[in-house]
């Protein structure tokens, strides 16, 4: 289920302040955040946001087609190492 339309999208206040300050200063700096639950707004476009995945901060460059999605969608938390390989010796 998605979020109710009457509530509107959610962004943590501290993240919004950091993005607005970065937009005013016009410097290309990476914004660190732990807020994976925040929705990407149009003001985020062009910014690089380092999203925490539980181990490290993953840099995410925000593009126009990402607007409306959550930051956590672009920083996977699990590493997939693949299935076990075929063991030729045990098949015989």
From Swiss-Prot:
According to the UniProt entry, its GO molecular function terms are: rRNA binding; structural constituent of ribosome
Q: Which GO terms describe its biological process?
A: ribosomal small subunit assembly; translation
Domain of life of the native organism: Bacteria
Database matches in InterPro entries: Ribosomal_uS19, Ribosomal_uS19_bac-type, Ribosomal_uS19_CS, Ribosomal_uS19_SF
What GO cellular-component annotations does this UniProt entry give? cytoplasm; small ribosomal subunit
Coiled-coil segments, which residues? none
Could you list this entry's UniProt keywords, alphabetically sorted: Ribonucleoprotein, Ribosomal protein, RNA-binding, rRNA-binding
One family from Pfam that matches here is Ribosomal_S19
The UniProt similarity line reads: Belongs to the universal ribosomal protein uS19 family.
Summary of the function given for this chain in its UniProt record: Protein S19 forms a complex with S13 that binds strongly to the 16S ribosomal RNA.
The name this protein goes by in its record: Small ribosomal subunit protein uS19
Q: Which organism is it from?
A: Listeria monocytogenes serovar 1/2a (strain ATCC BAA-679 / EGD-e)
Q: Lineage from the top down?
A: Bacteria, Bacillati, Bacillota, Bacilli, Bacillales
GN (gene name): rpsS
């Amino acid at each position: 289920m998605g979020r109710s339309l009457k509530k509107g999208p959610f962004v943590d206040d501290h993240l919004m302040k950091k993005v607005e300050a970065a937009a005013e200063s016009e410097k290309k700096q990476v914004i660190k955040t732990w807020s994976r639950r925040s929705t990407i707004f149009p003001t985020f476009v062009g910014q690089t946001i380092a999203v925490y995945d539980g181990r490290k901060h993953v840099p995410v460059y925000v593009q126009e087609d990402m607007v409306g999605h959550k930051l956590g969608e672009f920083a996977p938390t699990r590493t997939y190492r693949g299935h076990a390989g075929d063991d030729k010796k045990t098949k015989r």
